[in-house]
C-alpha cells in the first residue's frame, strides 16, 4: 500500500522549487522546473521500493546523471538532496531564459573564486584583501595569449592557473612572516599595484580600454556563444573545484592548514612545515582565481582593469564569510546568494543594494559563524550534553 506522505513529499519539494524560482524564471518555466524536481524525488522514492522498482528508476535519465559510486558515497539523508540538486542543475537551465542563465553562470564563476579564497582565508587563516589580483592574472594572461599567440581556451585554462599560482607563490614568500592586519595591508597594496599596472601599461594591457576579441571556448565546430554554454562550463568548473577542495580539506595538507590557522606556533612546534604550507595555500587559492579569470575572459571576450578592483576582492571575501569560513557548502551558498539576491531586488532598483547590505549586516550579526557551520551534522548526540 502506498504511503500518502511519501507521495506528497516529492510534490511538496516540487512546489517549493517552483515558488522559489518564479521571480527568476517566470511562472511557466518555474512550473516546468517544479515538475522536474518532483519527478526526481518520485524516482528516488521508487529506487527504495523493491527490486523491480529499483531497476525501473535506475534506468531513468535522472539517476544516470549521478549513477555508480556517487550514490553509494553519500549518506541516506543526503542522497535525495543530491539527486534533486543534480537534476535541477542539469535540466533546469533548459527552461530558463538567457538573462537568468547569464546570472547563474556568473554565480558559478564566483563559487570558484570563493572556494579559492577559502583555502587562504578559511582553511589557513591568512587574510587576503588582494585576491582579485590573481583573478586578473588569469584573465589578462589568457587574453594576451589568445589575442597575440592564438592560444585556445582549453590551453589557456592551465596556463592561467599556473600564472596566478606563480604570483601566489611570490606573494606568499614576501608575506611569510606577516599575519592579521599587517598581511591584510600588504595584500591590499598588492591589488592596488596590479590595478595600476593594468591601467597604465598601455603597450601590453591596452590600459583602461582593455583587451578586445579574446578567444571564446570551442569544442570542434561549436563555439561557446550562448549563455547556456557558459552555464554548463562554469558549473562544471565549480563542481571540479568543490570536489577537489573537499578532498583537500580532509587530507593531511588540509588538516595542517587548519592547524596553522588555529595556532601557528603550536603547529610549528608539532613539526608542521608552516612556511611551505602557507606558500602552498597562497598558490592553491590563486590557481582557482586564475581558472576563474580565464573563464571570465572567455565568456565576455573582453577584459578591462575595472573588472579587477579592490571592491571585487571584498565581494569575494564577503561570500566566504557569509557562507562559513570552513564550510565548503556554506561558501557555495554564500557565493550564489550574493550574486543572485541583488538581481532579485532589481524591482526596487534605487534601494536594492541598501536592502541587500542591510540583510548582510543582519545576517552576520545574528549568525557570525556563517550560514553553514562545518561538521555540525556530524556531532554525536551526547556531545552537547557532555
Please place each PLM-identified region on the residue numbering.
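Transmembrane alpha-helices and adjacent helix-loop boundaries
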Residues: 2-386
Amino acid at each position: 500500500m502506498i504511503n500518502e506522505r511519501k507521495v506528497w513529499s516529492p510534490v511538496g519539494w516540487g512546489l517549493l522549487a517552483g515558488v522559489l524560482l518564479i521571480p527568476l524564471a517566470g511562472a511557466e518555466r518555474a512550473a516546468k522546473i517544479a515538475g522536474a524536481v518532483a519527478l526526481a524525488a518520485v524516482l528516488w522514492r521508487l529506487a527504495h521500493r523493491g527490486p523491480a522498482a529499483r531497476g525501473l528508476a535506475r534506468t531513468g535519465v535522472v539517476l544516470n546523471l549521478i549513477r555508480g559510486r556517487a550514490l553509494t558515497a553519500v549518506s541516506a539523508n543526503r542522497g535525495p538532496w543530491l539527486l534533486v540538486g543534480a537534476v535541477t542543475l542539469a535540466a533546469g537551465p533548459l527552461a530558463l531564459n538567457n538573462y537568468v542563465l547569464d546570472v547563474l553562470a556568473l554565480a558559478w564563476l564566483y563559487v570558484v573564486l570563493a572556494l579559492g579564497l577559502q583555502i587562504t582565508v578559511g582553511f589557513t587563516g591568512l587574510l587576503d584583501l588582494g585576491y582579485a589580483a590573481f583573478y586578473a592574472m588569469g584573465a589578462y594572461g589568457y587574453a594576451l595569449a589568445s589575442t597575440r599567440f592564438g592560444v585556445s581556451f582549453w590551453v589557456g585554462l592551465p596556463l592561467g592557473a599556473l600564472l596566478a599560482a606563480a604570483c601566489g607563490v611570490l606573494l606568499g614568500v614576501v608575506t611569510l612572516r606577516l599575519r592579521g592586519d599587517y598581511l591584510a595591508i600588504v595584500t591590499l597594496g598588492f591589488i592596488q599595484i596590479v590595478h595600476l599596472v593594468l591601467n597604465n601599461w598601455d603597450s601590453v594591457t591596452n590600459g583602461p580600454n582593455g583587451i578586445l576579441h579574446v578567444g571564446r571556448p570551442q569544442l570542434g565546430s561549436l563555439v561557446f556563444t550562448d549563455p547556456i554554454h557558459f552555464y554548463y562550463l562554469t558549473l562544471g568548473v565549480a563542481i571540479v573545484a568543490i570536489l577537489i577542495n573537499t578532498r583537500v580539506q580532509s587530507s593531511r595538507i588540509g588538516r595542517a592548514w587548519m592547524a596553522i590557522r588555529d595556532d601557528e606556533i603550536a603547529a610549528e612546534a608539532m613539526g608542521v612545515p608552516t612556511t611551505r604550507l602557507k606558500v602552498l595555500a597562497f598558490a592553491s587559492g590563486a590557481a582557482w582565481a586564475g581558472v576563474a579569470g580565464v573563464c571570465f575572459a572567455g565568456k565576455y571576450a573582453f577584459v578591462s582593469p575595472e573588472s579587477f578592483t579592490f571592491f571585487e576582492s571584498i565581494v569575494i571575501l564577503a561570500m566566504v564569510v557569509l557562507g562559513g569560513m570552513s564550510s565548503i557548502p556554506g561558501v557555495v551558498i554564500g557565493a550564489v546568494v550574493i550574486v543572485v539576491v541583488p538581481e532579485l531586488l532589481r524591482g526596487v532598483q534605487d534601494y536594492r543594494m541598501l536592502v541587500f547590505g542591510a540583510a548582510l549586516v543582519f545576517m552576520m550579526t545574528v549568525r557570525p559563524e556563517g550560514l553553514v557551520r562545518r561538521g555540525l551534522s556530524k556531532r554525536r548526540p551526547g556531545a552537547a550534553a557532555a
